[in-house]
């Protein structure tokens, strides 16, 4: 570099390290309708001011780095940088703050959850100046959400495909989850579907293992679907898990499912990855397959209250990436899930427009415009005594999934399915008659037992089963 060039380049540039807050903390900033907004729970290291911590998050998740660089002068940082525009302390917690960050839309590739997360929840989560960091919520502007296809079909299209209206759908995860042969697995599916369920399901870790290769499982499950449909006159389905070691293999399995004529496939969207999930969602839209999503690995990311990412963010990401169902906790079963918090992200999955509501953990108003909704799936440690609460909590647009609560029936799989179907129909009828499911639920179930011996046997076997543990991740008081 010539001396003259070096002198010119030095104008406006001062090498060294400066506080992030000088550039990235902008409390005067007014957010734009096109900004992606993020709410981070920040726990700074001792001696780090909250403004500096919030600014560091904005910087490290957008245009910043640890020192001033020459190439800052070759672009417009004011146009592209993230901005920490507001910080508030977390009530009841020492040294925790909610830092609000606005990101310009041009920082993100259109239609790519992968790119969005690589920026917003990338290296910044290992930043030494922060003791812990959690992404609590995102506001996705319509200008960005419209670049995504979203769910392959959505709630109304699924209802029309199944010709089932006015009640939650019923499912069952086949157990034991690992070890059955394909033929015995298919037999269990058939018995559950014939007994009254709408769906049966592969467990999340059923892929293509030595005891049951995927193609054999697909064939026997398809046989179970067609046989049970012929006997009941209802449309049935089985969530065939297409998750695989490569995207190419995953699509190959989905193609085979389509050739068999089954209505739905399944994907583990976190372990499989967002790129693979979006590819599968596009294939399902183009080929008339519904897509069930399992959230295996979510608790690694979302369970700790001060670090990671809340499930409401993962739920929004799934709606963008694509899925027609997703597991969303039960409130009453064996898996983590506080009621108001769970209903908050259930609404984010199903509804078109959701108002900001901090009482339910919703930090931003979210407008999905015309993106189809996702059906929440309640699954994990539930049985017939839970049916009134589940019907009241989740409403009609949900899947209530009883694995052990079907297959653990003392008389077998088909009676277990019948017990669940009778319990559901009784609860829906009682609700439609104006009865209070929360107050009269047990009485409704006991009355139905009088004309359903299958339900009576199920009620007897599970009458004392409860999962009474305090949730780890609770709303701030």
UniProtKB/Swiss-Prot annotation:
Q: Which residues bind NADP(+)?
A: 60, 68, 127, 175, 295-298, 381, 404-405
Enzyme Commission identifier(s): 4.1.1.39
User: What keywords appear on the UniProt entry?
Assistant: Acetylation, Calvin cycle, Carbon dioxide fixation, Chloroplast, Disulfide bond, Lyase, Magnesium, Metal-binding, Monooxygenase, NADP, Nucleotide-binding, Oxidoreductase, Photorespiration, Photosynthesis, Plastid
| Pfam name, any one | RuBisCO_large
Q: How is the cofactor bound?
A: Binds 1 Mg(2+) ion per subunit.
SUPFAM superfamilies, A to Z: RuBisCo, C-terminal domain, RuBisCO, large subunit, small (N-terminal) domain
| Site (Transition state stabilizer) location in chain | 334
How does it get modified post-translation? The disulfide bond which can form between Cys-247 in the large chain dimeric partners within the hexadecamer appears to be associated with oxidative stress and protein turnover. The disulfide bond reported in 1WDD may be the result of oxidation during crystallization.
- Superkingdom is Eukaryota
The Gene Ontology biological process annotation of the record reads: photorespiration; reductive pentose-phosphate cycle
Q: Which cellular compartments is it found in?
A: Plastid, Chloroplast
Q: Which residues form the propeptide?
A: 1-2
| Residues the record lists as N6-carboxylysine modifications | 201
Q: Which GO terms describe its molecular function?
A: magnesium ion binding; monooxygenase activity; nucleotide binding; ribulose-bisphosphate carboxylase activity
The entry's Mg(2+)-binding residues are 201, 203-204
**How the protein assembles, per its UniProt entry?**
Heterohexadecamer of 8 large chains and 8 small chains; disulfide-linked. The disulfide link is formed within the large subunit homodimers.
Its biological purpose: RuBisCO catalyzes two reactions: the carboxylation of D-ribulose 1,5-bisphosphate, the primary event in carbon dioxide fixation, as well as the oxidative fragmentation of the pentose substrate in the photorespiration process. Both reactions occur simultaneously and in competition at the same active site.
Q: Any idea what this protein is called?
A: Ribulose bisphosphate carboxylase large chain
Organism of derivation = Oryza sativa subsp. japonica (Rice)
